[in-house]
């Protein structure tokens, strides 16, 4: 079965997102997203430069994890808060990241491949050094950081982990940047949670979320339209989907809708949360 975008559903989801201001979405990340909390806390403890660079490099290896994403970033925080204060320069941060990937059980699947990927990225030394010394580059010129990583890694397009790495590093810098949003014009990184939201919202017809992860183009077109229509940058839409996208896969639709509304209500107006949940969860997310 070929995937199909249902544009009428895309417009309904976009309308629900358009009820939110960018300030509300940033506030949601700050209050609810465990990734933001851990990375920004690390930046406050050891400095934005080291926190941003280490998050950037670890983000590149954040695939095929042997633990949930929330546990992975907690493992990152605990390791880096003890190892980064002693790290000196780019080489020191790289060694700290290698130590994390070697010791954290979440990296057990393909550990050597993860280490090789991070070491290849280190060839973009000029840009990585700028992230360390002037981390605001992640807000002021994020596309340059992303392009340097792409070239260093030999990627023709942008892998989802490469885009994600810039986003997670940006979290370390945002408090310094006056809560400026990340406006990278890139396709949304489609992981399991985004794939499930694409199906459960009925924006994308597909046999399973695995099919959407393997062939993400339809989902990326749909979420790109949602971002343009709502005015919410796609990587901030991604934050909401990352926190809520597990529910349609693990719960029946009615329970999943309630769970998503409850999560959104932690930081958003209840009426807006219920409306958005009603558009995001309309059917189960099949695994295939």
UniProtKB/Swiss-Prot annotation:
Presence of the UniProt keyword Lyase in the record: yes
InterPro entries: AGOG (IPR016544), AGOG-like (IPR015254), DNA_glycosylase (IPR011257), HhH_base_excis_C (IPR023170)
Keyword field: DNA damage, DNA excision, DNA repair, Hydrolase, Lyase
Residues spanning the signal sequence: none
Segments of this protein annotated with the region Helix-hairpin-helix: 134-203
Pfam families: AGOG
Active-site residues annotated for this sequence: 160 (schiff-base intermediate with dna), 191
Molecular function GO terms recorded: class I DNA-(apurinic or apyrimidinic site) endonuclease activity; oxidized base lesion DNA N-glycosylase activity
Catalyzed reactions per annotation: 2'-deoxyribonucleotide-(2'-deoxyribose 5'-phosphate)-2'-deoxyribonucleotide-DNA = a 3'-end 2'-deoxyribonucleotide-(2,3-dehydro-2,3-deoxyribose 5'-phosphate)-DNA + a 5'-end 5'-phospho-2'-deoxyribonucleoside-DNA + H(+)
Highest taxon above the source species: Archaea
EC number in record: 3.2.2.-, 4.2.99.18
Keyword DNA repair in annotation: yes
Any one biological process term the GO annotation gives: base-excision repair
Binding site for 8-oxoguanine: 35, 62, 73, 164, 189, 238, 242
NCBIfam families per the UniProt record, alphabetical: PRK13280.2-1
Function as written in the Swiss-Prot or TrEMBL entry: DNA repair enzyme that is part of the base excision repair (BER) pathway; protects from oxidative damage by removing the major product of DNA oxidation, 8-oxoguanine (GO), from single- and double-stranded DNA substrates.
Domain-level remarks: Contains two alpha-helical subdomains, with the 8-oxoguanine binding site located in a cleft at their interface. Contains a helix-hairpin-helix (HhH) structural motif and a Gly/Pro-rich sequence followed by a conserved Asp (HhH-GPD motif).
Similarity section: Belongs to the archaeal N-glycosylase/DNA lyase (AGOG) family.
Protein's name in the database: N-glycosylase/DNA lyase
